[in-house]
Amino acid sequence: MGFEETELRLGLPGNGGTEEVLIRKRGFSETETGHEDESATTVDLMLNLSSKEAATTAAAAADPTDKHKTLPKEKTLLPADPAKPPAKTQVVGWPPVRSFRKNMLAVQKSVGEESEKNSSPNASFVKVSMDGAPYLRKVDLKMYKSYRELSDSLGKMFSSFTFGNCESQGMKDFMNESKLNDLLNSSDYVPTYEDKDGDWMLVGDVPWEMFVESCKRLRIMKGKEAIGLGLAPRAMAKCKNRS
């Protein structure tokens, strides 16, 4: 018997023959040869890549104007004229007012203007002040028909004060300087008014219709304070000019 037949080997029974083992196993030389081939291929690929990069770098350094040509073409993919964003709506006011609310306000405004126009020729409101009284009043002169009615109404408004009455014929009494001086020297209050010219005159110096048209404001002052205003000459001159 030979040595090979009696040699102990690790393996399954029946797997005899070294030829099969040699077929399934690679030797050291084959392994080294395979590694050398792979490294050579890798080196070749790296050399090819490095050579391309070197060529590109050299071309860019030689001609700097071609730098834009080597850039990626991502920018060319963008649209040349992008669509503009939609214009924002203009905010007129805040909070917003609905259309029916606007229409209602417009109607109310027009009605108010028409009522003022219609009431203006039929009304003549003037403010009334009195020396010593801490309040003002407003009266419509066209509601009265004479100086007597106006005097009674003013007496009720300022009930805590007393002042001389101006009757419908009071104009003739004011033209008399002696009676005018007696009235001004008394302790009673005298009604005066400011006309369109800005002059202060005594109430009753002109006819009632003319007084209603020219009166802008009424003031009830003490008779002694009305002496220095020089109302009588102006009243007589204006009355003569208007008559």
UniProtKB/Swiss-Prot annotation:
What Gene3D superfamilies does this protein's entry cite? Phosphatidylinositol 3-kinase Catalytic Subunit, Chain A, domain 1 (3.10.20.90)
Please give the InterPro entries that the UniProt record associates with this protein: AUX/IAA_dom, AUX_IAA, PB1-like
Basic and acidic residues bias spans: 64-76
Q: Name one GO cellular component term.
A: nucleus
Q: Please list where the region (Disordered) is annotated.
A: 54-91
The recorded induction information for this protein reads:
By auxin.
* SUPFAM superfamilies to which the protein is assigned, alphabetical: CAD & PB1 domains
Q: Which residues form the PB1 domain?
A: 123-223
Keywords from UniProt, A to Z, are: Auxin signaling pathway, Nucleus, Repressor, Transcription, Transcription regulation
What is this protein's function?
Answer: Aux/IAA proteins are short-lived transcriptional factors that function as repressors of early auxin response genes at low auxin concentrations. Repression is thought to result from the interaction with auxin response factors (ARFs), proteins that bind to the auxin-responsive promoter element (AuxRE). Formation of heterodimers with ARF proteins may alter their ability to modulate early auxin response genes expression.
Supply the PANTHER family for this chain. AUXIN-RESPONSIVE PROTEIN IAA13 (PTHR31734:SF28), AUXIN-RESPONSIVE PROTEIN IAA17 (PTHR31734)
Q: What is recorded about the domains? A: The N-terminal half of the protein contains two conserved domains I and II. Domain I includes a slightly degenerated ERF-associated amphiphilic repression (EAR) motif which seems to be involved in the activity of transcriptional repression. Domain II is required for the correct degradation of the protein through the SCF-mediated ubiquitin-proteasome pathway. Interactions between Aux/IAA proteins and auxin response factors (ARFs) occur through their C-terminal dimerization domains III and IV.
State whether it acts alone or in a complex, and with which partners, per the record.
Homodimers and heterodimers.
The family note in this entry says:
Belongs to the Aux/IAA family.
Q: What name does this protein carry? A: Auxin-induced protein AUX28
Q: Which gene produces this protein?
A: AUX28
